[in-house]
Amino acid sequence: MLASVLIVAAGRGRRFGDPLPKQYLSVAGICSLRRCLDLFLSLGSIGAVQVVIHPEDMPLYSDAVAGLTDMRLLPPVAGGETRSKSVTCGLQALEAHTPDCVLVHDAARPFVSARIIADVLAALETSQAAFAAMPVVDALWRVEDGAALSPVSRDGLWRAQTP
């Protein structure tokens, strides 16, 4: 199975509070987007990588991809007003490549592992959709008007590793 990757990097990161969008922040000397690109482009199971960026971020994007010559990295496309619209823009750009499947990843999550990617691809061999998740282990409480009312059962709850 040859997968395409759609990396969503069009967000503004306003909740984060930094004027620079999270995907362009340096983590141990390498920007988050570049860490994602380096990982996905190191995998032989990836046939194309499409990045969706904010229309005003081309200079930041160019800095992030400086020196990358892998032909699987497609020219970036502009995102939409929301994350879902940005994903749609990216999927439309990938249509011509007719991938077997598309992995959607957020550029602000630089520490995904090759193992997690392999596990998701393996799940896609027998399923139409898959995502990385972890069981909920934290205590959960139902709160109303600032008062804790009752604990919530964690049975059957999983934390998706996506926003």
Describe these PLM feature segments.
Residues 7, 33, 90, 105-106, ...:
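Residue-level signal for inorganic ion chemistry
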Residues 46, 99, 126-129:
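Short, high-confidence coil segments that cap the C-terminus of an alpha-helix
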Residues 107-111:
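Acidic metal-phosphate-binding loop of nucleotide-sugar-dependent transferases
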